[in-house]
């Protein structure tokens, strides 16, 4: 998994301070680790968007102005329901020897049988929550859809994990992850109306 550096600034919590920051392109955030005090920070919105909307997960080195760096990953992101802008982010610290739960983006591989028959592949669940050691975490998770037919889905319980023995999928086993939807039927041509000459 790629390591990305991201600058952060310490933030003092004041009334209406978060709203003022957002107007200047700065996103309020917190950094936390089990058993430690939560740290309030702010981060550049543009830099954060590149990470949040990436097709891959990243390990993030958060860099403070005093030179201190802490290793983390994005645990939660809140969006404005109207503008869809990022309004708050949670970063979780971790050490190399502890189990973590991380959301990893889903991708597909293979030429699905259903697609060859005219269907369209649709990812229903765009990220899987994986539990394991940080070193075992992939930047994305590919699901083989080669044998997937139209109208069929691959559920969490059907995803083979033999190649990733150190990882466990934490999502509900019955959750559909990817499916093949049937092609849309073309609209039937309107019946011609006979017009009699008068």
UniProtKB/Swiss-Prot annotation:
GO molecular function, one term: 5S rRNA binding
Keyword Ribosomal protein on entry: yes
Coiled coil region boundaries: none
UniProt keyword Ribonucleoprotein present: yes
Gene Ontology biological process terms from the UniProt entry: translation
Classification via InterPro entries: Rbsml_bL25/Gln-tRNA_synth_N (IPR020056), Ribosomal_bL25/Gln-tRNA_synth (IPR011035), Ribosomal_bL25_b-dom (IPR020057), Ribosomal_bL25_C (IPR037121), Ribosomal_bL25_long (IPR001021), Ribosomal_L25_dom (IPR029751), Ribosomal_uL5_bac-type (IPR020930)
A GO cellular component entry from the record: cytosolic large ribosomal subunit
Keywords: Ribonucleoprotein, Ribosomal protein, RNA-binding, rRNA-binding
Alphabetical list of NCBIfam families matching this protein: bL25_bact_ctc (TIGR00731), PRK05618.3-2 (NF004136)
Family the UniProt entry places it in: Belongs to the bacterial ribosomal protein bL25 family. CTC subfamily.
Function in brief: This is one of the proteins that binds to the 5S RNA in the ribosome where it forms part of the central protuberance.
Subunit: Part of the 50S ribosomal subunit; part of the 5S rRNA/L5/L18/L25 subcomplex. Contacts the 5S rRNA. Binds to the 5S rRNA independently of L5 and L18.
Protein name per UniProt: Large ribosomal subunit protein bL25
Source organism per UniProt: Chlorobium phaeobacteroides (strain DSM 266 / SMG 266 / 2430)
């Amino acid at each position: 998994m790629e390591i990305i550096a991201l600058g952060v600034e310490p933030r003092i919590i004041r009334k209406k301070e978060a709203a003022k920051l957002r107007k200047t392109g700065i996103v309020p955030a917190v950094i936390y680790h089990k058993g430690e005090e939560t740290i309030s920070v702010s981060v550049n919105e543009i830099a954060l968007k590149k990470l949040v909307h990436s097709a891959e997960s990243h390990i993030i080195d958060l860099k403070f102005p005093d030179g201190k760096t802490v290793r983390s990953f994005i645990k939660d992101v809140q969006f404005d329901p109207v503008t869809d802008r990022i309004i708050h982010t949670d970063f979780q610290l971790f050490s190399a020897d502890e189990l973590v739960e991380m959301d990893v983006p889903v991708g597909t591989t293979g030429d699905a049988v259903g697609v060859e028959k005219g269907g369209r592949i649709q990812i229903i669940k765009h990220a899987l929550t994986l539990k394991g050691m940080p070193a075992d975490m992939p930047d994305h998770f590919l699901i083989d859809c080669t044998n997937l037919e139209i109208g069929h889905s691959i559920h969490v319980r059907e995803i083979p994990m033999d190649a990733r023995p150190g990882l466990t999928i934490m999502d509900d086993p019955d959750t559909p992850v990817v499916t093949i939807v049937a092609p849309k039927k073309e609209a039937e041509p309107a019946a011609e109306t006979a017009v009699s000459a008068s």
